[in-house]
Amino acid sequence: MKIFLVILSVFFFNGCFGLAYKTPISNPPISYDPYTTTIGSLYAKNLKENPKHSAAILLEDGFDALLHRVGLIRMSQKSIDMQTYIYKNDLSSQVIAKELLNAANRGVKVRILLDDNGLDSDFSDIMLLNFHKNIEVKIFNPYYIRNKGLRYFEMLADYERIKKRMHNKLFIVDNFAVIIGGRNIGDNYFDNDLDTNFLDLDALFFGGVASKAKESFENYWRFHRSIPVSLLRTHKRLKNNVKEIAKLHEKIPISAEDANEFEKKVNDFIERFQKYQYPIYYGNAIFLADLPAKIDTPLYSPIKIAFEKALKNAKDSVFIASSYFIPGKKIMKIFKNQISKGIELNILTNSLSSTDAIVVYGAWERYRNKLVRMGANVYEIRNDFFNRQIKGRFSTKHSLHGKTIVFDDALTLLGSFNIDPRSAYINTESAVLFDNPSFAKRVRLSLKDHAQQSWHLVLYRHRVIWEATEEGILIHEKNSPDTSFFLRLIKEWSKVLPEREL
């Protein structure tokens, strides 16, 4: 067995690292004045008068977030840069792929950077776009083995590299508009999945923050572990499917009636957008992102530093929503100190029944009861949240995916960063720190609404229990709600795993 692993290791190390360093130099990005584009001209006057400010539109609703992406693609004139951790091959993803293809046909330069962990298949529609003359697709830190079922062997042989992923999410249009937040590309991020939908949040920013996001994208795009699709071992087989590009419109599984309705909604969005009918917030926005070299060598996290600084400086309240919550000893000390000063700490995260990572919940449990006893308001998402919130939809489960923090109803940290060791030390992340009280209050109200529909963890006779209101009746649970004994047992077993590796 040892000999087998040694041979496997040599094979993978030679294969993976050889692949990484053969990356050709990409064409330089095109240069233009973003204020002269359709989108840029809409906000040119206000932002040129206040060059230190950025403008923001909050995207709370999943379907609205999809409309913004599609609408921005249709209004684009020069370039689109997309960076994401997950790109599924479902309805929403196919719609966006089709829109990107249409933009490229108009002459828009499109660059797509995907993490290999979140790619459904080398033969997904998004990969086919690489054969268009105006579209480039790269894969970040790819596996040498392209068959997903066999990748566990590569993980054993090259674990230190494979575990480090690009978790950033950026959607940059014409170097002027950028969507930043927690949403990947897939049906369950846009409230369009019948099995599981994610509660999430992102925002559309205009102005200076977009140029900083663009700089970050360029760093990742030129990084030696961003590999062109043309260098993947499956490229020749993928090329055989190149004719499928022309059939993207036909492949989307949607009725003519639904297609017409969607078309109407996109056109309505564009009209409202160009008439400034969406609430717009102006303020100082700081773009924060890890360097891509973080996956090769330990580097400090600018987002973690900004979070800890804002947490220490909070004077009144902090509201944290994080799908994964493993704060660690240092942050727990800050929490304790701030609560002792009378600062209100609210935490919203996943329950055992709503999480998509049982091992992470096992680690969260080490801190959960301590936080309740400290005096923090701790909430866990109910997995039937969506069914109770939106009538007529039949999603069987809902899960928190957002990563948003509001400090003193004034400052908002929004992006891909979870409060856990993986975001701090292993993955690369991106976020924006936005200073606008009205925006912060709107975000807090949204998070508060989620919390009120969730389980509230409270002390009862020195024990932490789950409490919620259902049809006006207060209900209690002594164990993790909506879970089986077997699920709770797996959670207990998972606690043997080291926190830093989760």
UniProtKB/Swiss-Prot annotation:
SMART domains named among the record's database cross-references: PLDc
Membrane topology label: Single-pass membrane protein
InterPro entries tied to this protein: PLD-like_dom, PLipase_D/transphosphatidylase
Keyword tags: Cell membrane, Membrane, Repeat, Transferase, Transmembrane, Transmembrane helix
Entries under Pfam families matching the protein: PLDc_2
Record GO terms (molecular function): phosphatidyltransferase activity
CDD domains referenced in this protein's UniProt entry, alphabetically: PLDc_ymdC_like_1, PLDc_ymdC_like_2
Keyword set includes Transcription: no
Transmembrane segments: 1-21
Entry superkingdom: Bacteria
Gene Ontology CC: plasma membrane
An annotated GO BP: cardiolipin biosynthetic process
Family that this chain belongs to: Belongs to the phospholipase D family. Cardiolipin synthase subfamily.
Name under which the protein is recorded: Uncharacterized protein jhp_0176
Organism, scientific name: Helicobacter pylori (strain J99 / ATCC 700824) (Campylobacter pylori J99)
